Amino acid sequence: MPQQELEQKIAENLRLYRTLHGFTQAQLAECLSYSDKSVSKWERGEATPDIGILYTLSEIYGVTVSELIGQTEKSKETQEKLKAVEKDRKALERAKKKALERAKRQKKKK
C-alpha cells in the first residue's frame, strides 16, 4: 500500500475508533497527554502518531495495531459495533429532522 494511502487509512481508522468508543478529540488527547490539535491532525492525515501512541490506542480500543492501521480486517465484533453505531447515527439524524420540523411548525403557529 502506498505511503499516502496508508496514512489516510490510519487517519480514517483513528477517527472511526475514537467515535465508536464515544471519545471527543479533547477527551482522547487528555488520556494520551497530547493536545486535541495533535489528535485532530492525526485524524485529518496531516500527521501520524508514533508507534507508542498507536499501541496505546490499540489497547484503549481493544483492537490490534494492525487493525488500527488498516492492515488486517476488522474483527467481527468491531464490524457489529460499527453497524450499531451507524444505525444509531441514522436514528439520531431522523430524530433531529423531526425535532426541527416540529420547531418550525410551532414557530408558524405563533
Regions found by a protein language model. Give the residues of each.
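A short, Lys/Arg-rich alpha-helix, primarily the initiator
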Residues: 1-20
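Residue-level signal for the short linker/turn that defines the boundary of a DNA-recognition helix
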Residues: 12, 22-23, 49-52
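Residue-level detection of the helix-turn-helix DNA-binding "recognition helix"
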Residues: 19, 33, 44-46, 73
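Short alpha-helical DNA-recognition segment
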Residues: 22-41, 56
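A secondary-structure capping/hinge motif
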Residues: 38, 45-48
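DNA major-groove recognition helix of helix-turn-helix/homeodomain DNA-binding modules
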Residues: 52-67
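Short, charged recognition helix plus adjacent turn
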Residues: 70-106
